[in-house]
Amino acid sequence: MRIIMPVEFSRIVRDVERLIAVEKYSLQGVVDGDKLLVVGFSEGSVNAYLYDGGETVKLNREPINSVLDPHYGVGRVILVRDVSKGAEQHALFKVNTSRPGEEQRLEAVKPMRILSGVDTGEAVVFTGATEDRVALYALDGGGLRELARLPGFGFVSDIRGDLIAGLGFFGGGRVSLFTSNLSSGGLRVFDSGEGSFSSASISPGMKVTAGLETAREARLVTVDPRDGSVEDLELPSKDFSSYRPTAITWLGYLPDGRLAVVARREGRSAVFIDGERVEAPQGNHGRVVLWRGKLVTSHTSLSTPPRIVSLPSGEPLLEGGLPEDLRRSIAGSRLVWVESFDGSRVPTYVLESGRAPTPGPTVVLVHGGPFAEDSDSWDTFAASLAAAGFHVVMPNYRGSTGYGEEWRLKIIGDPCGGELEDVSAAARWARESGLASELYIMGYSYGGYMTLCALTMKPGLFKAGVAGASVVDWEEMYELSDAAFRNFIEQLTGGSREIMRSRSPINHVDRIKEPLALIHPQNDSRTPLKPLLRLMGELLARGKTFEAHIIPDAGHAINTMEDAVKILLPAVFFLATQRERR
């Protein structure tokens, strides 16, 4: 066994800190007439900024979690801030764009888990979860009103006049479209037998334009909120239909009435205006706005931290500088298709390290969600592993978004089942293809759960594993969750207590043979700490090799550089230490 020398440890610390510190920006809209509203991970935390083409102006006093989506040109910004040391009990704060830093707490909104929201400048409409309900709320001159109870996770997409449109995970894993009325409240839910709705926006004609993701493709439809009738949307240009997307990640109407759409295929997106494709940098893009006569969006790739660019030139407006030595540590990336146990092909992104030999040490990095996607987008975890000399394999296991509804829904009723086989297939591919000399596994949230599943159900496949903010016991987690997460667990497990019990790693501790690092935020309210403490006791009682890091006063969401370092650094250092054990 070779011991990591202090100089190597120092390099890992320095590189991880530098990667976390790189400024990252996402575009939220246009406010104060003609200023861009940007949320940035900068100055060591998440903050809201105004950008007028020159300098940025910070709006908030203290770090935030997010902002509510603003209508074009409004003179204020609604900030979302955790006021519970990471437990995701959020409060709302208003700041006028003309008086940066002068925050006013909206006292009518008691702390709750804020899921989404839109600010019209006169009314704030948002969804929130408490222990006993998920609801749609409005805050305006009449005070705070509950417009409707929601069956599960719900997200406000748009408001036009009194019409509110949104999306929700209301049953069976599918995504429904819903509408409500700002004045009178109420809830109408629209489902499609073909698949799930994705991003939605209200047209000038007061119909809801939405993405409809079916078994293996995605298309645009309009939904009449009066009768629920659904029609395919015809666009002036055929570029969009020729692109044949599998996902629609964002859409919205520009002030001039044109429809902007961001669609994705094989982990990369394309931008369309009224169906015509707009030249954009390769990678992925966020919302699109019209600003001073030009299109602006956010852009990222596996080698490019999130930044703000104009289209079609791709000229950066706001970006963080990635140090050249760290840029070189990312030797390249590609998408491969891995055959799984049932003949399914698992779309898998591969990030090769410029600091590792081939074959070399390789980490299977498993994304959370599970309804999420690894794509050609910046990932600080993956970049840190590459800088530490690991190749990275990122499988989009069944349950992942971006590859059609058929693939996404395969996970329902089968957690720690088929998707674990997909992750295992990606690991075997890494070795058989000549990329990996030895294999490790790492994940956060549902990815941490996959680490525990792999070490309990697939002993011997990986040399060691890192489980961050992981699910340990579905039954106990259910009892500790609020209304939104209880509904999520019911949908994922099919409501089966037997599935919850049999697919919980706490019940299979005896099978763990490889070293394990546990990293968990103290105040995590999505994957609570209590089950992990029981797991630690079981590991200790059985003489298993493990280390544990509890991050004080932190929650599931990583919103400060300090929390990011406390989570990522022990993970990378643990894997680097295990790599030297022969």
UniProtKB/Swiss-Prot annotation:
Superkingdom of origin organism: Archaea
Subcellular location field: Cytoplasm
Gene3D superfamilies referenced in this protein's UniProt entry, alphabetically: alpha/beta hydrolase, Peptidase/esterase 'gauge' domain
GO molecular function: omega peptidase activity; serine-type endopeptidase activity
Keyword terms: Cytoplasm, Hydrolase
Keyword Hydrolase found: yes
A Gene Ontology BP annotation from the UniProt entry: proteolysis
Pfam family, one: Peptidase_S9
InterPro entries: AB_hydrolase_fold, APH-like_N, Peptidase_S9_cat
Enzyme class: hydrolase
Active site: 445, 524, 556
Catalytic activity of the protein: Cleavage of an N-acetyl or N-formyl amino acid from the N-terminus of a polypeptide
Keyword Hydrolase: yes
EC number annotated for this UniProt entry: 3.4.19.1
GO cellular component: cytoplasm
Main location: cytoplasm
Physiological role: This enzyme catalyzes the hydrolysis of the N-terminal peptide bond of an N-acetylated peptide to generate an N-acetylated amino acid and a peptide with a free N-terminus.
Family affiliation: Belongs to the peptidase S9C family.
Protein name from the UniProt record: Acylamino-acid-releasing enzyme
